[in-house]
Amino acid sequence: MAVISMKQLLEAGVHFGHQTRRWNPKMAKYIFTERNGIHVIDLQQTVKLADQAYEFVRDAAANDAVILFVGTKKQAAEAVAEEAKRAGQYFINHRWLGGTLTNWGTIQKRIARLKEIKRMEEEGTFELLPKKEVALLNKQRARLEKFLGGIEDMPRIPDVMYVVDPHKEQIAVKEAKKLGIPVVAMVDTNADPDDIDVIIPANDDAIRAVKLITSKLADAVIEGRQGEDADVDFAQEAQADSIEEIVEVVEGSNND
């Protein structure tokens, strides 16, 4: 049984690609048709490939993989943080800092600084410092938490990276590829799929679409860690809709 049904994908707007003039020809095989100047993603392929992504992430999690969720644009930031936390994993949902993976030693030093500032406050050191210095420390902590808070407790560079919009997160993808870290990604019609190991053709600009896909991969982590099915209920929906119905509902745009 599919982990995500055609009906769920349709309702979340996963089928809406970008304007045809913005497409990447390498995504042609994942495109079903074009309507009103918008490419329509072939959701039959999305259903199958989402299954493959789920299995890949579940199996990795079962082997204690460290999984990093990445999505820094506003449509993705909240879902990426929430679902990574729910799965007990790690995330980056603000700007990707160049060298986050390839210069992990330096990043660890910044994380150590973040933990040091937190410890200073917890131990009461702030009460002994001038207000101006405390203000500077709080400002530094806020900035470090913004960019590194989601990986503060990540024990090592990730074994798997999940990306929302690899077109935007090109630096992150390149760092992962350089280090041999497999990348699972939501790939829209404007992106280059070549550097993605496990592709999920999907609208990566709609909040509902991002939430749907990201939550299912979080479920995969949970299932892998627990050795049992995550809490999903889609059995009656999975075969409810056909690809032909997509044409009838494509009247929207690539936004939530």
UniProtKB/Swiss-Prot annotation:
Pfam families: Ribosomal_S2 (PF00318). InterPro entries: Ribosomal_uS2, Ribosomal_uS2_bac/mit/plastid, Ribosomal_uS2_CS, Ribosomal_uS2_flav_dom_sf. One of its GO terms (biological process) is translation. CDD domains: RPS2. GO terms for cellular component: cytosolic small ribosomal subunit. Keywords: Ribonucleoprotein, Ribosomal protein. The keyword Electron transport does not apply. Belongs to the universal ribosomal protein uS2 family. HAMAP family: Ribosomal_uS2_B. This is Small ribosomal subunit protein uS2. It comes from Streptococcus agalactiae serotype V (strain ATCC BAA-611 / 2603 V/R). The gene is rpsB.
